[in-house]
Every structure is written in structure tokens, then in C-alpha cells.
Amino acid sequence: KEATGEPIGISALVKPVGNLTVGIIGLTTPDTPFVTHPKNVVGLTLTDPIERAKSLASYLRPQVDVIIALTHLGIDADRELAAAVPEIDIIIGGHSHTQLEEPVVVGNTYIVQTGEHAKNLGYLKLTLEDGNVVDVLGKLVPVTAEVADHPAATEVVAKWGTELEEKLGQEVGATTVLLDGERANVRTKETNLGDLITDIMRDTVGADLAVNNGGGIRASINAGPITIGDIYTVLPFDNTLVKVEMLGRDLLAALEHSVRLYPEQNGGFLQVSGLEFVFDPSREPGARVTDVIIGGNALELDKTYTVATNDFVAAGGDGYTMFQSATVLVETGEMLRDAVASYVVEEGTIAPQVEGRIVAIE
């Protein structure tokens, strides 16, 4: 907490496991203020995870046999953590959704991660001698239909599933094509689902153009019926539609910010409507966008444009600080997923295509 310097939760704990004592450290990405809605981190300061880990590991090491870091940093940052804090024996990671079939070893530290969406159960067996980890066996157990149901979990799922099934299973329309919301795609390039969503945003609020962070699109929809549940899966966040007014130079800055990390996956990569732009990945970040066309005309730096976006981006989420100086014209309060559902109901059957709105010069 900025005001007191106190942590908002437990940073570490010591837990007896059989005849061993295990220390567990919790670490999250310092990018949190950029990848969540700014209102969620008001009054908080994110400390450097490596420096925090060094302090906690030094404190725990004399008390425990094993130190486990439970992290949400991503595989690359986990490697850096392992190299910087060798006192950590095991890193159980997340954030990058990396599926590690066996542990990655950095020095004497073992890094494991199961992928995403509960597709795998991680199994880890440690062998200790004289208080030191001397061997680790790690593997992934795929969670398939062959895995026996857990009675207590089944009871909970059945209870809530019955209440939700009727609503989420309601068909609102259909698509004749795959709606591409794959993580690797919406974070690096234009997709037909990104086009569809931003078209709906632009039409709903009546803006010149629309932008939506790719990281807010969480799944694809297969060709066939579209249900309310499908739309919730694609757009699980409670983002609402906002219409702002901003200068062309700020819009250009937003597009540069969108492609600054390309070809790396980036949750802030923008899906767009009402504009087309070309960028050159060989150029330095901040100077990659070469052409921008809005409504058939070249972008004018000093011209004012109306932009539809979501409240996360409008508040500066994903590092879009230029939106914080934009003039908010309308805060609709309408959920983005509700706008999408209404559109699909009205259209009945859809078949959006990629239109060449975003072009990378290769």
C-alpha cells in the first residue's frame, strides 16, 4: 500500500508437509498496473519481484527444507528469477501460459508450468538428501474425460451448472466461419473476430473508428451456433463501451504503442475498425507505423477523431496513457459482450472476414 508500505496480503508462508517444512513465496508481474483496469491498483505500488524474492528467500531459508515460488511472471521472467535467487528450489509459474512437459532447470532451480485453461495437472516429485533437493521428477497429466470426477467438485459444478445452463446455452445466432480469437493471433495480428468486435463497438456508439485490446479477447468460436456462453468465454471481462475524442497525433501514438513489441505477443495489440494502418517491424519501436488511413483519408495529426473503445483502454490500461488525456464524450455503461450479443441476434448468421486493416511489412 502506498500510504503505509504494508503488503495487501501474505507474501510468504511456512507449511509443514510430512516430515518437511516448505516455504512458499507469492510473486506477481510488475506489469499488473498496465494489464488490469487502473482502478484495481489505485493506492498500490508493485515492487520488483526479484528484489522481493531475494528478501523473502533469505528470511525463509534457515527455517525450511524447500522454497517454492508461486509466480505469475511468465516463463522468461521465471528464468531470470531462478538465476537471480538460487535459494529458490521450485518455481511454479503462470502468466505466459507455457506448457512445459518437463521442468526447465536453471542452476539448481526447477521451473514448471502447466499451460492454460486447466488442460493439464502438474505432477512434481522431489528427492531430498541432507535437506537439499537432489532430484526432481516432473510431468504433465492431461485432464481428459478419462480422469475420474471428484465427487465434491462435481456437486458444486452441478449446482451452479443447472442455474447457468439455460442462460448460457441460449443460442443467439450462428457463424458460417471460425471466429478467430486465439491468443497468439489476437495479440499479434488482425483477426476476423477482432474486426467483428470493433465494428460492433464503432457502430454502437457512432464513432469514426474503434480500437480494442487483443488481450481482452480470450477465445475463438467455432463455425456453427453461437450461444450466450460462447460470447462470455470470448469476452469474460466486464468492460463497457466508451466514446472519446482525441487528436490524430495521439491516435498515431496509440498505434505505435500497439505494435511496439511485435512480433512478440502483446495483450495491448489493438484490433481496429474504421481505419487501416501499415507498420514496419524492422524500424525502431515508436517509429514503426508508416501509413494510417481513416475513412478513406490519410490521418491528420491535428485533426480530432471520435474513437470507440472499452473502459479499460480509455482509463489508460495496457499502457495507453494517451487515452487518459482524451475527452470522454459518452460512457455508455453497456457491456461490450452485451453489444456483441445484440448484434448477433439482429444479424442471425454472420461470416466476418479479415479485411487487411493491419499490415506488417515483412
What spans do the regions from the language model cover?
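Glycine-rich phosphate/diphosphate-binding loops and the adjacent beta-loop-alpha structural elements
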Residues: 170-192
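Short, compositionally biased low-complexity segments
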Residues: 29-30, 165-176, 227-229, 308-315
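Generic structural detector for well-ordered beta-strands
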Residues: 14-16, 125-127, 178, 245, ...
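Short amphipathic
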Residues: 137-140, 171-178, 243-245
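Feature captures C-terminal
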Residues: 10-12, 133, 195-362
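Short, solvent-exposed loop/turn motifs
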Residues: 21, 110, 182-183, 276, ...
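Acidic, metal/ion-coordinating pockets
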Residues: 1-162, 186-200, 210, 260-263, ...
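Generic signal for short, ordered secondary-structure residues
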Residues: 32, 39, 180, 230-233, ...
